[in-house]
Design a protein with these regions (language model features):
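A short, conserved, highly charged catalytic patch centered on acidic carboxylates
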Residues: 1-98, 106, 112-117, 121-122, ...
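Non-catalytic C-terminal interaction segments of nucleic acid-processing enzymes
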Residues: 131-137
């Protein structure tokens, strides 16, 4: 699956109007494993001490990272709002060496609790998810 195929698939489900955060989980798993074939993305792995991140990323059976996904359009991917994702994100950032927070369109990478970078591969425009190829091409 390419990034464009992923975005098209996410958009098709999003436009139905009844999708939730969980609707897109399989698509993200497919994307990760397609663009980085040596990585396995396990959706809904076993709970760990700090909580239950949505995905665990493994390479040769070694845990190398985690992904926490929120619903498309989540306004707190930085985890700064006390009424948003702050408590959960702070807990994950302090316990997990590599974690990505995403709303399936925007991805924020933290290493050892420090924000490293973010990339938006698409955005919502007039109820449609539109690719931002200049950000990833």
């Amino acid at each position: 699956m390419t990034l464009e195929q992923y975005i098209e698939s996410v958009n098709a489900k999003y436009k139905l109007g009844n999708a939730t955060e969980h609707t897109f989980r399989g698509l993200l798993e497919q994307l990760i494993e397609s663009i980085v074939p040596e990585i396995r993305a396990t959706n809904e792995p076993k709970r760990i001490k700090c909580g239950a991140p949505d995905y665990i990323l493994t390479k040769k059976e070694i845990e190398i990272g985690y992904v926490e996904a929120k619903d498309i359009g989540d306004k707190d991917l930085a985890g700064i709002k006390k009424t948003g994702n702050k408590e959960q994100f702070d807990r994950y950032k302090s316990a997990l060496p590599n974690i990505i927070f995403t709303d399936y369109l925007d991805f924020h990478l933290y290493i050892e609790g420090v924000f490293i970078t973010k990339v938006a591969i698409a955005e919502i425009q007039n109820g449609t998810i539109v690719s931002l190829p200049n950000n990833f091409a």
